[in-house]
Amino acid sequence: GATTSSGYVGQSTSAVYLDELAITTSGQQPSVRMVDIARIEALAGPQGTLYGADSQAGTLKIITNKPEMNVSELILDISVRDSSEGKGSHDGSIVVNIPLIEDKLAARFVAFDAKDGGFIDNVYGKTITNDLKADALYGRSPSGWGTLDNADVVEDDINDHKVTGWRAALRWEINDQWSADLTHIQQKTDSGSYSGFDPNVGDLQDIRYNEEFYKTDYNMSSLVIEADLGFAQLVSATSYYDQDLSFNQDITNYHKSYSAYYCIEYAGD
């Protein structure tokens, strides 16, 4: 979604919800794995105070399937794919619904493991040469012009993407008017290099000098209590959300171009 930012810190103007749990973050939003999902609601903006901050441009609400009373269910979904230009891929998930107390209590468990095989090759190359010799002028360039090669990180299919996680939910039908849902979700994402390539180097090829990665790890817990009060509907949502994000992107050639054109030594008196 769109963001408003100052420097490197961005605040989203569109909100993302997983059931009643707000998972909107600064900058890029978490990518929820679409397993055992009932529906997705796209609510046009601007939204009011029901969804709070970050809803000026709208709200995306992902609704999961809830535990079903008196139903025993097992769902397996497995797929395998191959590619002529890269590594193979797979996608597997399992859904289990377990009734615990008749008409009162049920649990639902979801687990998934998926991998998208890479198809971008990091081929051998050297850094660009620049006539301005900005390394001597600037003094902070990490390598000499035209001398650094990427022999240590040359590899095929560097842009693979892996995701694993699980979701556990417990639903209690307290009576005809009251219900409670307790949910916990964990998801880990481990991606390699970015999927762009340089057509001047070759088809699906690029020259990168550092190992790239993008990793996320998030945990979510929520307790939602709903009630029919007769004169109104009550929805109480209490949640905890924690996300760790780390990434590394190679900008060696960009740094060299920047240094050459913007770091100029002016002659003094």
Functional labels for PLM-detected ranges:
Residues H90, I158-N175, T183-I185, N210-Q249, ...:
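Outer-membrane beta-barrel transmembrane strands
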